[in-house]
Amino acid sequence: VTVDCSGYPKPACTLEYFPLCGSDNQTYANKCTFCNAVVEKNVTLNHLGEC
């Protein structure tokens, strides 16, 4: 599974909850917060859902 993070980072994210588990073992609330971390910290996707 891959997440398309083109167009990120964004200055603000919505509050929708669709959790993604990052390679840093942190649960990101949604694609926007995850993709911001990808751009800022070079995180990758471990799996969909909470860590």
Swiss-Prot record:
Residues 3-51 form the Kazal-like domain. Glycans are attached at N42. One of its GO terms (cellular component) is extracellular region. The keyword Glycoprotein applies. The record marks L15, E16 as: Reactive bond 3. Its main location: secreted. GO terms for molecular function: serine-type endopeptidase inhibitor activity. Keywords: Disulfide bond, Glycoprotein, Protease inhibitor, Repeat, Secreted, Serine protease inhibitor. This is Ovomucoid. It comes from Nothoprocta perdicaria.
